[in-house]
Amino acid sequence: VTLDDLGAWIIKCNPRKTPLESMRAAGEARSSWCIADNYRSRLIRPGQRVLFWVTSHPRRGIWGAGRVTGDVTVEGGRLHVPVRIPLLAEPVTAAELLTVGALRAMEVFRSPQQANPSWVSEKEWTLLEPLLPATGMAAG
């Protein structure tokens, strides 16, 4: 991934390890997520789009859409990214996304074990964005 072809970051959440109940009650994902210390973490910038992908759930898929809210920080020896990700009223499920042929190549399908953050390309974002409810994320 490069800044030129980045459509949005994806933060994945496994509800077997990170409970969803408090996030659902609050209507948004938690505000900080652990990410891998690699070249991707150095590409993250405030204002970039970020999607919230829930794994290991009968309705796995995109549960929220928002923005990176600040610079990556070190907390407890690990990198964290600050975000604001309002949850969608209903998730856009993996099954729904797979009906769009070109979205089958999304990294979350090709490499589901990839550490946070995953990403979608600008081309994938163009196909994905109309499937999301109005989120105010259209502009870069």
Regions found by a protein language model. Give the residues of each.
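Compositionally biased, charged N-terminal/linker segments
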Residues: 1-46, 120-140
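Aromatic- and Lys/Arg-enriched surface recognition patch
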Residues: 61-125
